[in-house]
Amino acid sequence: MKIPFTPNQPFGQANPMLYGHFLEHFHRQVYGGVYDPTSPFADEDGFRTDVLEAIRDIKPAIIRWPGGCYVSAYHWHYGVGKDRPATFDKAWRVEESNEFGTDEFVKFCRKGGCEPYICTNGGTGTAEEMSDWVEYCNLKEKGIFAKERIENGYKEPHNVKFWSIGNENWGTHEIGEKDSKEWSRLVKESAKMMLRVDPPWNFPPPPSPT
């Protein structure tokens, strides 16, 4: 068999969304990694400038956050506003300060020149909690969570275009393991509520429990 090819002939353009990265609250990925207000490399928002420079250099089109296994017990509301309680991270069994939350993640992505992609809690989360997160990020002023974002200093919506539901909730290792019937109902109802809050966003299919 012969396969002819022309090495210098362009045949199409790769979608930049093929090249992305993943940021989880795991070991030093966030604290001491991308975010460290005590570092001599920290900017005015606590982001490490050396990491931001690296992000701008490799040019990922998109970054997913907050997990990973971590997201299956993560409740986003603890990570916004001035009063943020420290919580126990049931995935990695450490204390989470919640100092780096939604607003910080979106700001980090904007500074790095990439799109923020939020993965919601498909383990212990609810459809309402997920849709409230969309409201906080994307609605201009309608609703208590959009108003809360404004009170937190972000008048304009974050306009997060990429969302998904859950992580590896098919596995026994994951908090909030679900069978196929439980999973399909959660995804269906969560997506329905999220889309009713803000329809025009991208919804990558979540992994399906077997």
Please provide the spans of the model-predicted regions:
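Non-catalytic accessory regions flanking glycosidase/transglycosidase catalytic cores in CAZymes
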Residues: M1-T210
